[in-house]
Design a protein with these regions (language model features):
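C-terminal-of-GTPase-core extension/linker across diverse P-loop GTPases
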Residues: 40, 44-63, 184-404
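Short, Lys/Arg-enriched N-terminal segments with co-localized hydrophobic residues
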Residues: 24-45
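Conserved G1/Walker A P-loop phosphate-binding module
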Residues: 41-126, 132-133, 138-140
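Conserved nucleotide-binding/hydrolysis micro-motifs of P-loop NTPases
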Residues: 69, 92-93, 116-119, 143-149, ...
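N-terminal polybasic/positive-inside topogenic patches
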Residues: 7, 16-22
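Extreme N-terminal basic, low-complexity initiation segments
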Residues: 2-8
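Long, charged N-terminal accessory/stalk domains
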Residues: 111-114, 119, 125-231, 275
Length: 404
């Protein structure tokens, strides 16, 4: 059930919560009719990120920071995962709402799932592995702080060792899935040849060979074979964001993530990112008002909170961008993959918009702000008319014109 005031769910509702999709409504101009109607948007696909790591590294602290959940709601003493929906802070959307007053602000969202205890124990027992496989990416919390009361995993502080230990268990988990499937495939192929099964068999053998060399699948150039194995949702294929949890004395070391990435050899690894936070400091920050929080951050030489840093790093890792729509009733931020077209964006808002797509009217956020109004942007020629193949850029404001 929902934990009051926290926006999180416990494991009893997790399976249901993961299938819930946000619904939205927009006023839309019907091309050629002069009418405006209220239509439901398509189901909003929210990015899902699973928080994993060893025990006593600060996973739940990070979850509380991101979701503004309170400790009492999580301290059930039971091995439950918790889910929280986080609004993605975006100053550009805030500015649009000021330009178009009276409209509701609808931020893009990210779901975070906090897995209980050590991820190694979860993988070995199979508990909640299925829910982890449904994530778009993993946020692996790595301990980089000393605490006399809570000893570090393995008895000594060694972030790189902890990364390697978790990676190995993830690889073994994927290998177990592959070996089980290969046994079934080989039995079926002995009975009858099947091109699709043969392609799957070959792709799984490629994956198996890489994993046996302890190479995670995210670092393997699978090419067309990646589409063949996508349905297995292999954990080692998922992008991973290493979240370095610093001690209080290191909170101002904003370069810590870059330094650690270089030392651990993570910088050049594909589908891998690093962010640094100080869980203790950020937990204190979450209890303050906006004004006090800004002063508190400044005292540590920080320009932004961990929420902004982790979400930005997650977006970069997943290769997604934001575009905006301004309707009669709301200003909304949408998340879409980098390289997506205007036609893709129309489908993100509503499938009917995609089917009846005529054109997109697009203006850069900066140009719209400089113009001061949509009418002025149009008169200056800043509102561009684009076709369905137009590739969207981060921060563009999009108006979809479509047939009724």
């Amino acid at each position: 059930m929902l934990v009051p005031g926290s926006g999180i769910c416990n494991a009893a509702a997790l399976a249901i919560a993961l299938d819930v999709r946000l619904r939205a409504f927009l006023y839309v101009s019907m091309e050629g009719t002069g009418r405006r109607i209220l239509v439901p948007c398509r189901e909003v696909q929210v990015l899902k990120i699973g928080i994993v790591g060893l025990g006593q590294v600060g996973k739940t602290t990070l979850f509380r920071i991101l979701t503004h959940a309170h400790g009492s709601g999580l301290a059930s003493g039971r091995p439950e995962a918790h889910l929280g929906v986080v609004h993605v802070p975006d100053a550009r959307l805030d500015r649009l709402v000021k330009m178009f007053p009276g409209r509701k602000t609808v931020y893009a969202s990210v779901e975070y799932v906090d897995s209980p205890g050590s991820v190694i124990d979860l993988l070995r027992t199979g508990i909640q592995t299925a829910s982890l496989r449904e994530m778009d990416a993993l946020a692996h919390v790595v301990r980089a702080f000393d605490d006399e009361v809570l000893p570090p995993p393995g008895g000594s502080l060694d972030p790189q060792r902890n990364i390697e230990n978790v990676e190995l268990e993830i690889i073994l988990s994927d290998l177990a899935v592959i070996e089980k499937r290969l046994e079934r495939l080989e039995r079926d192929l002995k009975k009858q040849k099947n091109p699709a099964l043969e392609a799957e068999h070959l792709a799984l053998l490629t994956c198996k060979a890489a994993l046996e060399k302890q190479t995670p699948l995210r670092e393997v150039a699978l090419g067309p074979q990646e589409a063949v194995v996508r349905g297995f949702m292999f954990l080692s294929l998922k992008p991973v964001l290493y979240v370095l949890n610093l001690g209080e004395k290191d909170a101002a070391r904003t370069q810590a993530a870059e330094e650690f990435a270089a030392e651990a050899g993570l910088k050049q690894r594909p589908k891998t990112g690093v962010a640094a936070v100080s869980g203790k400091i950020e937990a204190e920050l979450a209890e303050l008002s906006d004004a006090d929080a800004a002063d508190f951050l400044a005292s540590f030489g920080l320009a932004e909170s961990a929420v902004a840093r982790v979400i930005r790093a997650s977006y970069q890792l997943l290769g997604v961008v934001s575009f905006f729509t301004v309707g009669e009733n709301e200003c909304r931020a949408w998340t879409i993959r980098s390289g997506a077209t205007a036609w893709d964006a129309a489908g993100e808002v509503h499938s009917d918009f995609q089917k009846g797509f005529i054109r997109a009217e697009v203006v850069k956020f900066e140009d719209l702000v400089a113009a001061g109004s949509l009418a002025e942007a149009r008169s200056r020629g800043l509102l561009k008319v684009e076709g369905k193949e137009y590739v969207l850029h981060d921060g563009e404001v999009v108006y979809i014109r479509h047939a009724p």
